[in-house]
């Protein structure tokens, strides 16, 4: 497996990945997703040869805050260290940044994954998070 920057947006490949994990809010707005990729700070992909296994996308200013927007791995390739490798690459790249944040599904699986990678819930540091969602 190789982690490298994802520089050439392949819409069918990306939509297939997002659909495979049930993230239809993104696939329902493919133009917004395309623009999101284009404007991301860093997009990484995990490949085995030319086969896409997973992807990560970060946004932010790269100095005071980085937000891990997406980490997705095709279901048949999950639990093989791919998500960990993508996230570890982000953490290494932005080790100088004070705040690296993310939002995730509220499931035991995802919570355990991010805790294993050194993340804590906002409530542990006296904070909470808010979100306003729309797709226009």
For each predicted feature, which ranges?
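Acidic/histidine-enriched, beta-strand-rich ligand/metal-binding domains
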Residues: 69, 76-78, 93, 111-113
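Conserved acetyl-CoA-binding loop-helix of GNAT-fold acetyltransferases
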Residues: 73, 79-91
């Amino acid at each position: 497996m190789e982690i490298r920057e994802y520089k050439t947006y392949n819409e069918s490949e990306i939509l297939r990945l997002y659909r495979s994990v049930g993230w239809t809010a993104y696939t329902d707005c493919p133009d917004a997703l395309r623009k999101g990729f284009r404007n991301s700070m860093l997009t990484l992909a995990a490949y085995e040869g030319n086969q896409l296994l997973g992807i990560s996308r970060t946004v932010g200013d790269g100095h005071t805050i980085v937000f891990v927007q997406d980490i997705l791995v095709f279901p048949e390739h999950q639990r093989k260290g791919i998500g960990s490798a993508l996230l570890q690459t982000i953490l290494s790249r932005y080790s100088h940044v004070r705040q690296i944040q993310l939002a995730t599904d509220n499931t035991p699986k995802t919570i355990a994954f991010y805790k294993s990678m050194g993340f804590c819930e906002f409530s542990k540091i006296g904070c909470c998070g808010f979100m306003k969602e729309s797709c226009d």
